[in-house]
């Protein structure tokens, strides 16, 4: 039986696109820091990383799609923070950004990672941006490396 498993060490360079939402930038900058830390620790060079900032989480899927279609990247990491407020806006944004990123992932030949926090309050977002619940930007970048290597292994 043949088993495929992604690795965190790559024989070939990996080019990563990162899409960051500027809304809740205080949180998103921590997610980006985590993602860049993960990539650096796994020998991804700065020249192989491109970061694009969009106004908010709702705009992430469009730019993720443009990056994926450009064929310049092996993976795209999407980072944002949607925090519940007192209106239903949160529900709509969460649903659409989730669907949008999933659609980009399914309709492109590269991994598109979901690193968008969807939290009830600012405390939960802070916890997931580098404190007691880890850093979801770091986790998303690690998953991107693993998925790129898994795809390369399957396509050998």
UniProtKB/Swiss-Prot annotation:
Ligand binding ((2S)-2-hydroxy-3-oxobutyl phosphate): 86-87, 128
Reaction equation(s) it catalyzes: (2S)-2-hydroxy-3-oxobutyl phosphate + 5-amino-6-(D-ribitylamino)uracil = 6,7-dimethyl-8-(1-D-ribityl)lumazine + phosphate + 2 H2O + H(+)
EC number(s) reported in the record: 2.5.1.78
Pathway(s) served: Cofactor biosynthesis; riboflavin biosynthesis; riboflavin from 2-hydroxy-3-oxobutyl phosphate and 5-amino-6-(D-ribitylamino)uracil: step 1/2
GO molecular function, one term: 6,7-dimethyl-8-ribityllumazine synthase activity
The protein's name: 6,7-dimethyl-8-ribityllumazine synthase
Enzyme class per UniProt: transferase
Family matches, as Pfam families: DMRL_synthase
Similarity comment: Belongs to the DMRL synthase family.
Gene: ribH
GO cellular component terms listed in the entry, alphabetical order: cytosol; riboflavin synthase complex
Keyword Transferase: yes
HAMAP family cross-referenced by the UniProt entry: Lumazine_synth
Protein task: Catalyzes the formation of 6,7-dimethyl-8-ribityllumazine by condensation of 5-amino-6-(D-ribitylamino)uracil with 3,4-dihydroxy-2-butanone 4-phosphate. This is the penultimate step in the biosynthesis of riboflavin.
Residues engaged in binding 5-amino-6-(D-ribitylamino)uracil: 23, 57-59, 81-83, 114
Keywords: Riboflavin biosynthesis, Transferase
This protein's record includes keyword Phosphoprotein: no
PANTHER family: 6,7-DIMETHYL-8-RIBITYLLUMAZINE SYNTHASE (PTHR21058:SF0), 6,7-DIMETHYL-8-RIBITYLLUMAZINE SYNTHASE DMRL SYNTHASE LUMAZINE SYNTHASE (PTHR21058)
Coiled-coil ranges per UniProt: none
Cited InterPro entries: LS, LS/RS, LS/RS_sf
GO BP field: riboflavin biosynthetic process
NCBIfam families registered for this protein in UniProt: lumazine-synth, PRK00061.1-4
């Amino acid at each position: 039986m043949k088993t495929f498993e992604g690795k965190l060490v790559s024989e070939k360079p990996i080019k990563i696109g990162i899409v960051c939402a500027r809304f809740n930038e205080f949180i998103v900058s921590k997610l980006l820091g985590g993602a860049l830390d993960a990539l650096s620790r796994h020998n991804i060079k700065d020249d192989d990383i491109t970061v694009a900032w969009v106004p908010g989480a709702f705009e992430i899927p469009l730019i993720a799609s443009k990056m994926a279609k450009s064929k310049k990247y092996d993976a795209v990491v999407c980072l944002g923070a949607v925090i519940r407020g007192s209106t239903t806006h949160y529900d709509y944004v969460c649903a659409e950004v989730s669907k949008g990123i999933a659609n980009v992932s399914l309709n492109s030949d590269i991994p598109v990672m979901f690193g968008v926090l969807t939290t009830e309050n600012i405390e939960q977002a802070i916890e997931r941006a580098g404190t007691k619940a880890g850093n979801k930007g770091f986790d998303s970048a690690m998953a991107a490396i693993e998925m790129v290597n898994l795809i390369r292994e399957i396509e050998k």
